[in-house]
């Protein structure tokens, strides 16, 4: 087979250009990424050796070998893992299908330090090697395959694939280093980077180097060169070590390697269980949200091992989806090594591990919540996701309610439900909340005025998830939740009914509102729960449906709503006496537009609003 030339997909070209010219704030991470890829290849081979009958007799000792040539300025990373065939090379090193490149490019912020930290999270770590290499040669042979292949590229838009000779399965990557990055072809540089990022990769990493010694003295001194190969990492599964052997620094360094994240985690939970079930878990709560946290196809951050043998990192059932930001490891002593994904989903052992793990993680989040300042660091990125648990995790619902924080009418900061309940007024029977599209509009809602008169606080819920989960939350600590916009809640305020004589007094004016706004509203009502506002657009049934549709990602169709009027307001009292139909119509539309502004924060037809306003002002002056 002669050399076949291929062109990188457009997005990969963009990525390579960024790698070469922009994302150079922390170049050494290229080695972390290549070692991590090698470790993944060894994990996959280990799993196949346990589950594939054809590979059960394979005699191999999994390891990673690093070597360099300082004269030629090359660095080589070699593993004896699963290897790749020609299709794998094209798919993984040339196209966007498995690279996550598109997501990476869309997440870039322009901050070189932050952007370089994203590399590993998006599965584009291989390309980071072009930060230091002017040319890369990959030689690889897939396990149980007779043919090996070479992949060559200088990162300038094209790559070549050809057949080559390679005895053992696995992958060997040789980097031809740029002059300014030739220091990576040195024993001490490689040793330092591996110890910093890959100390607890669960496979031995060997470094081959030439050791130079001098014997004799003066003219008789001789230089003796000896090639040596030394293991430079602990190769121990950190989660299997005793807590007493580990320092905070060890946990944090392992996280940065494991999660491909340069930032430190907020917290970690290391737990070993012995008894009827034996397993170890190590979970991390990150300080930043994963890029795909709100995507349907998010990647699980938890790896499952059985007796230190990697099983999967693609099972979203290991933890509930509302904890999808958690990274870590579950290592079971009791699961069968050849467990399939279908068996995993029905396995009682794993179900018990999952249940206990959730409780451990929630307890750690509760511990974080004791310190308001630190809890803000957790709640800002992960609070919305945590709320999702109210919808499906009934077992931990009470615990989740304790952990949630809300804005309210009376407080300028996020508060807990416990704080809200501690400030309940003597006759207050419920916890009131108001749903809306954003916090500013909620704070301006005329509905809040009557609650304020009673001294009742109202929770202001503007997250999209709120409309989905809150109607299903019946109570907290025996106190019911109620939507502040619902008629039942307004009755609890003890408001007086609108008397018949008042309705008769406003009958003609209400008819004028209905005639002018017949294409906009479904009706007009007099309301006793408005204080300073003249009018309010309200329709609790349609509002609930709209909130649900937004949460489900559907567009909300325009629907006619009820316009509520405040019969005690001076403006309406004066409109009762207005005999100029043209002027009355302008006032009616202005009041309706004002109510729309309070509801939406914007008007569909701002031009007409402005014309009506100018007309009224002109007559008033």
Swiss-Prot record:
UniProt keywords, alphabetically: ATP-binding, Chaperone, Cytoplasm, Nucleotide-binding, Stress response
Region annotated B, chain positions: 342-547
One biological process term in Gene Ontology: protein folding
Keyword hit for Manganese: no
Positions of region (A): 1-341
Gene3D superfamilies in alphabetical order: 3.30.230.80, 3.40.50.11260, Heat shock protein 90, C-terminal domain (1.20.120.790), Histidine kinase-like ATPase, C-terminal domain (3.30.565.10)
GO cellular component: cytosol
Source species, domain of life: Bacteria
Pfam families: HATPase_c_3 (PF13589), HSP90 (PF00183)
Region spans: C: 548-621
Positions of disulphide bridges: none
GO MF: ATP binding; ATP hydrolysis activity; ATP-dependent protein folding chaperone; unfolded protein binding
Function per UniProt: Molecular chaperone. Has ATPase activity.
NCBIfam families xref list: PRK05218.1
Database matches in HAMAP family: HSP90
Protein name from the UniProt record: Chaperone protein HtpG
Record gene name: htpG
